[in-house]
Amino acid sequence: MKTQLSIFFVILILCTWSLDSKSKAPTDIKFNVYRNSSLIGFHNLSFSQMNNDIKAEIEIKFEVTFLGFVVYDYYHKNVEMWSQGKLKTLDSLTDKNGEELSCSVSKLEDSYKINGTSRETLSAETIIPTSYWKNELIKGVKKKTLNTQDCSVIDFTIESLGEKMIYNNKVLTDHYKLKGKESTGEDVIIDIWYDKFGRWAKMIFIKDGSEIEYISKKFDKSDE
């Protein structure tokens, strides 16, 4: 009887481990995006589970106006497939104020095929895209990332700035500063926050002298 019970509990533990080891789709993430405190658009990420893979669909829309005229328009659509924590495929299209950009990545047996506006190559390196939702991005002090707009490379240095309470002391986060340079030579300086579950919670960066701030729609009072 004791032997049968032991076997039963071993099987139960193995089955539980098997279920827990499968990838689970993260919670959807939605940001309102502000430029110098004025709302200019959104950045939404939705996730779904497909067998053991995770599908991430990312949509970004910015529109800056002046005296009623649109002076800057940006749209980005990106679909990523992840398997066992590794990027499997990525396909993005970007309209950057009239400039069309693209990036496509597919996992081969022992490398990645990369085809984008900036380059076409094979790479054996693990790819971390600049979609920011995976906190693998901030692990370590340096990280080579793939710009999801055009498949160029951004080398980031990463500084941990410690724990911070955000959204009126409602969310405890870890705060990081990323510094890098785009292929155009433009500096990239980002402040980014992840909550204690590793979920992307907030972001601020400077673009063309303006402060761009991402605020979670869940905590944005302007949505009330």
Which stretches of residues belong to each language-model region?
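Positively charged n-region of N-terminal signal peptides that target proteins for export
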Residues: 1-7
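Bacterial N-terminal signal peptides
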Residues: 7-16
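Acidic, serine/threonine-rich low-complexity disordered tracts
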Residues: 22-108, 133-224
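Acidic/charged, solvent-exposed loop-and-adjacent secondary-structure segments enriched in E/D, K/R, S/T
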Residues: 111-128
